[in-house]
């Protein structure tokens, strides 16, 4: 049986491959997006997942997994934006874009491992729909923090919320068996 760390890496490998291909196709055009724009893109993906979970009929041939991949990659882009700021023009070459991606993944995986140790892998007993709801809750929190110009009184910042959404998405994909594909 794979360890959580190995399963995590397998999911991230799928996401990184798509990110890499899109970087080759489009460059880093996403660097012009402000954080609320990225948050809205993530929200659209999460709402779509919830809709797929609730509806039997699908009119677009995409599944939950592709939307979770989108959430992961958009959250990583948001973490990069937090550190680098918004660019007026695309300003990252392919290698730098991949390096920053890997850096954000490493930090987020370390957070997961620390929380996983403390919570005893409780996520393994959760439903994918519950993880989707937690992602939507995090998005509502992020939107509120953005509306408050990034200020919080007692809560964690936007970056921690993006990291949690990445980890919840990875967990959902593991529960769906996508780490074995």
Regions inferred by a protein language model and the residue ranges of each:
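Intrinsically disordered, low-complexity regulatory regions
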Residues: 1-181
